[in-house]
Structures are given as structure tokens and as C-alpha cells.
A protein has these predicted regions:
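N-terminal accessory alpha/beta regions
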Residues: 231-327
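Beta-strand/beta-sandwich contexts
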Residues: 36-62, 123-155, 198-212
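Active-site substrate-binding loop specific to GH73 endo-beta-N-acetylglucosaminidase modules
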Residues: 238, 278-283, 316-563, 709
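Bacterial lipoprotein signal-peptidase II cleavage site
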Residues: 26-34
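Flexible, low-complexity segments enriched for small/polar residues
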Residues: 219-226, 265-267, 479, 483, ...
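Immunoglobulin-like IPT/TIG beta-sandwich domains and homologous Ig-like subdomains
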Residues: 67-75, 89-91, 95-99, 111, ...
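Bacterial N-terminal signal peptides that target proteins for export
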Residues: 2-12
Length: 712
């Protein structure tokens, strides 16, 4: 049948909503006949959608009892990853990137009549970027690296500072970088980000944090001068600068270890020994105390002036440690004197109860010998740079003679435990130990003869025990070996196992004269060690090879401070940490000999590399460190909770972007200098894992890597 409309023949009757006349089959319909409606589909919804968001579309089906539709994108049922996808409910999700043509057609096709459909175009736009934080860290002079973290950044995004575009490097969807010039004295820097067209629009504005110190400098300093950096302490050093942070630490009061009471409390009696409490006190102090530099220097001193609870009563260890911590920022002579008078050292190396010898005999030489050989001078004469002095035949020159050892031993006689009130006992030796006060002298037991010491110095006869002690210590303190011998070891413990002779010489010069004519000023020495060009070389050179193997206790404290922890022991004890470090051949004040856990002169077999901490490293310890790392990241440490769950700080970063989480691990544990290939491998290893497992695996891979085990 044909349709006749206003005199025109249109063909088969398909017109809708009009009055029609139908001729044929012997019947006719007049102008007042009922209108016939044809099926139709109309699509309505947003005309634009941004990447990362969704748009909802509605299909209105007319003149069909079945109103169900199937959705298409660019004629593809359900869409695909190139043009975007759409659900049965009409929710359209654009692709991850803008397609070649950024407008697509969303179509609804009638289920009842597939030839009936409706479409609507939708333009795909770039997202609006969102800034979470912006940080500017110095490179040199007024040049800064600006790091902008946030979300929805796309390749081609543009950073603006103060309304002006700056050359921008796209790192990831959550990070952008730029090099900017910030004039001296600038306190505020407004930053926003504009993604490129289509749909370019400015983000929120934030004020960038302008730091005095870059992340690598701050993190490396904290690695050298504390028991491990955390994000908070890194930001603190960035804000204050290296020199000001050191000054702040010098003025931070010490955090003393609590004295262990007598009789022992039950918590100390688990192994019938006070070491449980003594070691717990040490772990808690070094992990949580604000006086991190003081405690780190005290730790270094404890590995030079060695005593051990293997032979000493552990009650005296807390007093001894507090002595080192209190004296850490004083003068090296003060350290020598207070160590010599401490009951812990007295008992350990037999100066305690060493009385004057009968005619023809000599008093105990133990302390006299070790004080010179291990603590202050060394066996052979040194140049100011720590290298050996040689005689005309090319042989080392001994620092002292056996006869001089005996003379010093005589100078150290007459000392015993103080009474409970700190006074001199009525009898010698005092059989009642006082572990918490300096030793006192019983003059009748002191050798009052004259003594000939180093460099021909003579202590006159008739002096008191204290006068002889001070005279003997001054004689050693003034010896030119002390500076290079002690300073090299401090450098080894804090910065690098292999300091250059020039580095040692620079610090020795400060030891000899702090600039004001004072010898042995520990604050000047410590500042010089940490601020030396060799100490800071790795701040700007990620390939710098100086540093040292992290000894077990430092490896553990660095991890715990880096990720955070909660002590869950009913008594607040930290002692369980000793059980783990002991498996790696180290625990607080438990060296097996006066030579420390490792001697400063240790050389890796088969090499000429001086690397003291490697004396603790072997196949078994390497495997045990891997096992301990697994326990740490999986929260299996007795008495502690270590949260690396999906809701932890690292977990939240991983949920937003695994890249950001790995970068944060790099900031905390690798000075913000994680090698690119390592970062890529870690991200590949965690791809596809759940959020919590991403955090744990990434953390494990970082802390067990050789790049982390050796602190550069």
C-alpha cells in the first residue's frame, strides 16, 4: 500500500504522527481516522565526560511494551577499552586515555525491535587534576626541584607557579616534577596544575612547602646521625637544614635509661638476669628518644669503649650507657675520665680493686693496656690522616712500651666500689657493689711512687689516686695519636667504613683545635664529621660508594623507625628485640670481647677493603636477616605490632597509586635515590597483588636489597 500525503506518494507507510490516507484493497480511511505511532528510542545523558569519571545515560522507548535496550559504544556492544565501556544500566566509563577521536556515540538498541535505536554523542575530556601536596627542595642556589603529588595528572600536564607556566616533567598520574627558581627569602609559592586539551582546566591551588634541604641530604644525615629516619624527621631536617638540626640536637636533653632497681622486679627475672630490663631500656630509648644524635654517638662510643654484660652485672650497664650519653657532647677528656671511673669499666677490665703491688710485682695491667691499645692511641704511631708512621726501615713505630703499660697500671691503683651514699668504704676492697656511682679511691691502696709515662712525662711521687688518674689521662689525651685514632673510628661508625686519609686529617685537625684553642671538643668533632664534604658527597651523587654495612641493631632500628610500630607487651618491655638481633650476632652491650662485635680494622677476606661490620656477615646471617625481614613485614615480631595493612599509611598510598607507595619507601629507606631499574622491578613484582600484599612485598624487597643493607 502507498501513502498519499498532501497529494504525494511516499511509498510504504512509515510516517509517524501525521494524518494519512491509505488507498487500496477497496477501502478508504478519511481525514479523521485514528493516528498510528511507530516505535522509537531516545537517548539522553551528559554531553561530556572526563577521564576517571563516569556518565549515566537513559533510554526512553516509545510505542513498545518491552522497553529493554542493549547498549553500544560506537556500534560495539558494551564498548571496549579503546572507546570506553557501558553497563546494562547505561553507565558509561571512558577509556584510560583519550581516543584518537574524542567524541563517541552511545547507542541504545531496542531488545524487542533491534532495528529501532537511538544515539547520543559524548565528548571525552581530560580529568581535572587535583593536588594533594607540593614540595620544593633545593638543588643549588635559587634552583629548586618542585614535586607535585596528587591525582588525575595526564601526560602533558602543566605546572604553574605564581600564575606562570614552568617546564613540567610527567612522572606518573600522581606525580609531576619541575625545576623552578625561587628567590631567596620566599616563604610562599602558589602552585596549580592544568591538564592539556581537550577539557583543559586548572586544579586546586596549594602553597608549596619550601625546604632548605633536599630529601637525599636530610635522609642521609638521619641515617648517619640517628637510629633511622622517618618521614617526619626527614621533613624536620628539610625544614631546618643540616647545621641547624645538629645544633638543635646538641641542645636536646638526654633520655636516660632507667636504673634497674634492687631487688629485681618480676619483669626482669624472666631469665633470672637484669639484662632483660637493661636491654629493653636501651631499645626503647634509641627507638623513641628525641635525643637521637646523642644516643647514636653514645652507641658509637660504646663500640669503642667496650664493656659487656657477658661479664659485667647488667645493672651497671644502664649507668655506663647514661655516662656515655651524658658525655657525648662534652670533651673527649671528660669521656676518658668518666669511663675510667665507672664501675662497669672497672669491673670489666680489672681497674676495680686493683691495689698497689708488693715490692717486685706489678698491678693489674688490663685497663692500662686496653685504654691505650683499643680506646685512644692504637699500637703504632699515626700521622694526622690516620696512616701509619714508618721508621727508616719502613716499619711501624710502636706507640708505647711494656714498661709504660706498667707505669700506667700503677697510676690506676686504689679504686673500688663507692658506698651506697657514694662515699669511700671503710675497708678495701669494698665487697658491696655499687653499680650506680663512680668508683672511689682508697688512698692506702694507691701506688704513690713516681711514674714515667709517654713522651717522658713524669707523675711525681706522693700524689693522690685522683691526681695520678688525671695526670695519666691527660698524658694520653695530649698524645697526637688520639685525634686520628678516635676520629677515624667515629667516622666509621657514623658515616663510612673507608674514610679517605684527607677526611680523617680534616676531622683530626678539629679534634686538635675547635677553632677556639680547645682540644677534644666533641660537638665540634661531631659537626665536622657530619658536615664534611665526604660525608655529604652522596647527597647529590646517587652512585657514591662510601658508607658501611648496616650492623644488625641499626638495620632493625632503621626499619622500625621508618615504618612505625606499637609496643604491645603487657609490661612495656622491648626486650624481645634482643632475641632477634642476637640471631644476627649482635645485641646491646653484649660483645663477646673487648674488641667489640667487629674490630675497626677488619678487611673482607680476599680484598683490601676495610669494612668492619662485614665481620658479622656470613651465609647463615644473610639467610637469617631475610627470615627476620619476613617476620617484620608480616607483623610476626613478639611484643610489637607493625602495621603494613591496606589501611596503614603505606597501604593508603598503595591503594591510590603503587608508584607513590614505592617512592615513599625510597624516600624513607633509600634517601629518595632508589635506582630506576630497582623501582621498575619492584613495581613489576607487586603488580596484580592486593593492596596489603603490595606493601609487604615492596617493603621486603627494599629492606633486603643490597642497596639498602649497605648504607651509602
Amino acid at each position: 500500500m502507498n501513502v498519499r500525503l498532501r497529494g504525494l506518494v511516499l511509498g510504504p507507510a512509515l510516517a509517524l504522527g501525521v494524518t494519512i490516507l491509505i488507498n487500496g484493497c477497496g477501502s478508504s480511511v478519511g481525514g479523521n481516522s485514528t493516528q498510528q505511532q511507530q516505535p522509537s528510542v531516545t537517548v539522553s545523558g551528559a554531553s561530556q565526560v572526563r577521564l576517571g569519571s563516569t556518565a549515566s545515560f537513559t533510554a526512553t522507548v516509545s510505542n513498545l511494551s518491552n522497553t529493554a535496550v542493549n547498549w553500544q559504544v560506537n556500534s560495539i556492544a558494551g564498548g571496549n577499552s579503546t572507546v570506553g565501556t557501558i553497563t546494562a544500566a547505561g553507565v558509561y566509563t571512558p577509556p584510560s586515555t583519550i581516543p584518537a577521536t574524542n567524541t563517541v556515540n552511545v547507542t541504545a538498541v531496542s531488545v524487542a525491535s533491534p532495528s529501532v535505536s537511538g544515539s547520543a554523542p559524548v565528548s571525552i575530556l581530560n580529568p581535572i587534576a587535583s593536588i594533594a601536596t607540593a614540595e620544593a627542595s633545593p638543588v643549588s642556589g635559587t634552583s629548586y626541584t618542585l614535586e607535585v603529588d596528587g591525582s588525575s595528572f595526564v601526560n602533558g600536564a602543566q605546572i604553574q607557579t605564581g600564575g606562570a607556566n614552568v617546564a613540567t616533567t610527567f612522572v606518573s598520574a600522581t606525580e609531576l616534577e619541575a625545576t623552578v627558581t625561587i628567590p631567596s627569602g620566599t616563604t610562599a609559592l602558589s602552585v596549580n596544575v592544568t591538564n592539556p586539551s581537550p577539557g583543559g582546566a586548572a586544579s586546586n591551588n596549594v602553597n608549596a612547602a619550601i625546604y632548605l634541604t633536599a630529601v637525599p641530604t636530610a635522609s642521609r644525615l638521619l641515617d648517619q646521625a640517628t637510629f633511622g629516619p622517618s618521614l617526619a624527621t626527614i621533613r624536620q631536617v628539610q625544614s631546618t637544614g643540616v647545621d641547624a638540626w645538629i645544633t638543635q640536637q646538641f641542645s636536646t636533653p638526654d633520655t636516660p635509661l632507667a636504673n634497674i632497681p634492687t631487688p629485681l622486679p618480676a619483669v626482669c627475672l624472666a631469665a633470672n638476669t637484669p639484662t632483660n630490663c637493661e636491654e629493653s631500656e636501651w631499645w626503647q630509648t634509641v627507638l623513641t628518644g628525641p635525643d637521637q644524635l646523642r644516643q647514636r654517638v653514645a652507641f658509637a662510643l660504646s663500640e669503642i669503649f667496650v664493656i659487656s654484660s657477658d661479664t659485667d652485672n647488667a645493672t651497671t650497664i644502664t649507668y655506663y650507657h647514661n655516662t656515655l650519653a651524658q658525655d657525648a657532647f662534652t670533651n673527649f677528656y671528660t669521656i676518658m675520665h668518666d669511663v675510667s671511673a665507672s664501675p662497669g669499666m672497672g669491673a670489666y677490665l680489672n681497674m676495680l680493686n686493683s691495689a698497689k703491688a708488693p715490692a717486685g710485682e706489678i698491678p693489674n695491667e688490663n685497663y692500662a693496656r686496653e685504654l691505650m691499645q683499643l680506646f685512644t692511641l692504637g699500637l703504632d704511631l699515626l700521622n694526622d690522616d690516620g696512616t701509619l708512621q714508618l721508621d727508616g726501615s719502613g716499619n711501624p713505630i710502636p706507640t708505647y712500651t711494656q714498661n709504660q703499660v706498667q707505669e700506667f697500671a700503677a697510676a690506676y691503683t686504689g679504686w673500688t666500689y663507692a658506698t651506697a651514699s657514694g662515699g669511700v668504704p671503710s675497708k678495701y676492697p669494698n665487697g658491696t657493689a655499687n653499680y650506680l656511682a663512680p668508683m672511689v679511691a682508697v688512698e692506702s691502696e694507691h701506688d704513690t711512687t713516681s711514674k714515667t709515662l709517654l713522651n717522658g712525662t713524669v707523675l711525681p711521687g706522693g700524689q693522690t689516686a685522683e691526681e695520678d688518674l688525671q695526670g695519666a689521662l691527660t698524658n694520653i689525651f695530649d698524645h697526637p695519636n688520639v685525634g686520628p685514632f678516635v676520629c677515624k673510628q667515629l667516622i666509621q661508625h657514623l658515616v663510612t667504613s673507608t674514610p679517605s686519609p684527607a677526611y680523617v686529617a680534616r676531622i683530626s685537625a678539629v679534634f686538635a683545635n675547635n677553632g677556639n684553642g680547645v682540644r677534644g671538643d666533641m660537638q665540634a668533632v661531631i659537626r665536622a664529621i657530619l658536615e664534611d664534604t665526604e660525608a655529604r658527597a652522596g647527597d647529590t651523587d646517587p652512585t657514591y660508594e662510601g658508607g658501611h654495612l648496616r650492623e644488625p641493631m641499626l638495620w632493625m632500628t632503621n626499619f622500625l623507625r621508618g615504618v612505625g610500630f606499637t609496643n604491645t607487651d603487657a609490661n612495656g618491655s622491648y626486650f624481645s628485640l634482643s632475641n632477634y638481633s642476637n640471631n644476627l650476632n649482635e645485641r646491646p652491650y653484649r660483645a663477646g670481647a673487648v674488641f667489640n662485635f667487629f674490630p675497626p680494622s677488619y678487611v673482607i677476606p680476599g680484598t683490601t677493603l676495610n669494612a668492619p661490620e662485614f665481620d658479622l656477615e656470613n651465609t647463615a646471617s644473610a639467610i637469617l636477616r631475610l627470615s627476620l625481614a619476613d617476620s617484620l613485614v608480616n607483623n610476626k615480631i613478639t611484643s610489637f605490632t607493625i602495621d603494613l595493612s591496606a589501611t596503614s599509611a603505606l597501604g593508603q598510598l598503595a591503594a591510590a597509586s603503587p608508584d607513590q607507595m614505592v617512592d615513599m619507601l625510597g624516600t624513607i629507606f633509600m634517601h629518595g635515590q632508589m635506582p630506576t631499574d630497582m623501582r621498575t622491578e619492584i613495581l613489576s613484582a607487586i603488580s596484580g597483588l592486593g593492596t596489603a600484599q603490595q606493601v609487604r612485598v615492596a617493603t621486603f624487597l627494599v629492606i633486603t636489597s643490597s642497596q639498602y643493607k649497605v648504607m651509602h
